[in-house]
Amino acid sequence: MKKILALLLAVFMVVGLFAGCGTDKPVETTAPKADDPVETKAPVADETEPPVVQDENVLPRNETLYFAGQQWGTVNSWNVIGTNQNNAMAIAGGASGYRSIMFETLYMYNPLDGGLYGLLANDDYAWNEDMTQMTLTIKDAAKWSDGTPVTAADVVRTWTIGVEIANGTGTTFGAYIDSIEADGQKVIINAAVNEAGQPVNPLKVLDFLTGAPIAQAAWIDTVAARCNNDATAILNDAGEDVVWSGPYTKYYADDQKVVLVRDDNYWGQDASMWGKLPVPKYIAHTIYADNPAGETALKAGEVDVCQQFIGNIQNLWLEDGLPISTYYEEAPYGVCLTMPTAWYNMNLPVLAENAALRKAIAMAVDYDTIIANAMTNQSPSFADVPRSLMNPTDGEQALYDHDAVADLQWAGNDIDGAIAMLEAAGIVDTDGDGWREWNGEKISLNAVCPNGWTNWQASMEVVAAAGEKIGVEITTLYPEYSIYQTVFTDPAQTEYAIFMWSPEAASPSNPWTRVNQFLGKDYVGVSNNWSGNWGQYVNEEADALIKQIPLTTDQDELIRLYTELTKIYLTEVPSFSLMYRPSVFHAVNESVWTNFPNDDNGIPPMDCTDGYGIKALYELELVNP
């Protein structure tokens, strides 16, 4: 139905779109000037200048795909081996794969089927028998923007510089990869091993394949030389002369917008890859002040792809009649891959020593209210997808025995059950003031999330209300994010009792990575902890089970391990998820472009940019060609 609306309304909207693109300030890029920083050119054999737009303030609407919700603030750099680039359109790693518009990974991850699809590499990666070494080959057709081949040596240099300067690649995968070697076009990845000679974690090596952008060795050496091999200088280099392998490159960027232009010499048009160029010539992202501004632009047809939460999004087509689509035509509208979670702070004895208190609070929370109000039903309920360690996807749901844990699960708003659990544990109100005590003192907790994160704040209000219903005082606290992020990542903090953060969504290493975030002790005591187990929960039995999973290949044994871990999680309740949620939101306006990812075409709704989701750029069609 939405597709029909898109086509019916397109004729009326498209004229307005051309006019709507012009505002008090130019919303599009001007062509590069002669004195702009020199960019690396496309292959010399067929070299052309980037196309010049006749109107300097307006890109051709029927050649431009507009985004919202990805780029916030001005781009800092184009340095793919650096840090703090704030370059979301060109240099960003997502939970479901790297954003490979300009810089490419060896493989692309598809969260819909869990598959790894070759990008720079052929579909031939293979482990040796004991999973200590992986081999793969680089595609013969793969080229850099300067026309030189992408080689195995580029992969090696990307790895070595990452380790040397401790950039994202080096720090993320350094514990799991010992070294990488090149043998012609063959890449040999040597896994890090433990004292027994076993690989530390083969699953994280798979994450490297889809999560580490490959940089050109020659360019890396150029940057290192001009920075005198100083790690800090290399990390902060602007990278204006960067060489790329992807289908788009930088065209224009300031504090108002970022524009990338298609490289018409892109190697991926070879038959061994896509066999054609992506459809849009330009990728543009206006830098909006906030989510409401981006939503307004989406409604007006000034944005094609919007990565923002939009409450009651169905009203945009049901009530407003706008040609706006989501991945699913019905709720939850998107593919829910992650679970925003309330974490208990185990540094507080009242929580660390009382599993009954932890579970009682979790049982009392009205999740249906959270899903209806905070998520406007853009999440399955916990009655539809009972809680576990898994996201709602079919692949993960098949990894544990549902019947074996059914008696431990809860759907929420079970006030009587929660009260009975507290009474049985001796956590009672002894002085008649309506609040329960522990060790002679009233239990007083807070429920915390960043100020301005409105759907999370709505969730914390429901948690606090649940506490009141069962006689446990819970007050809400909403610090500014700049404060919040320094506190919840401090392993010794005692300021926040119940606080929100999301575990990983989908990747080649999931659900293992998420389970480790929920129950593993690897992150306990880690300073500036952005990695997991933010509540500092320790369970030796769970940790031993977690460590077996990366080396387990038998499916039945995997199910047994994940089932045992789910039993521990639902019994101990070190945290509790409040909803299911997409890892990225994906709303599209079909007044100019159509044939976006949907549940019929096998392309994941990763905003046409992340992992295998980039395939969408090759399938788009103009509503009015």
Where are the predicted features?
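Alpha-helical secondary-structure segments
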Residues: 66, 151-158, 185-188, 246-247, ...
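Aromatic- and charge-enriched surface segment that lines or borders ligand/interaction sites
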Residues: 123-168, 188, 294, 350-353, ...
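N-terminal lobe/hinge region of extracytoplasmic solute-binding protein
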Residues: 68-129, 243
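Periplasmic binding protein-like
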Residues: 67, 147, 298, 304-305, ...
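Detector for C-terminal structural segments
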Residues: 257, 364-402, 455-464, 489-625
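Surface-exposed binding/hinge segments that line
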Residues: 171-227, 590
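Gly/Pro-rich hinge or "lid" segments in bacterial periplasmic/extracellular proteins
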Residues: 93, 97, 111, 210-277, ...
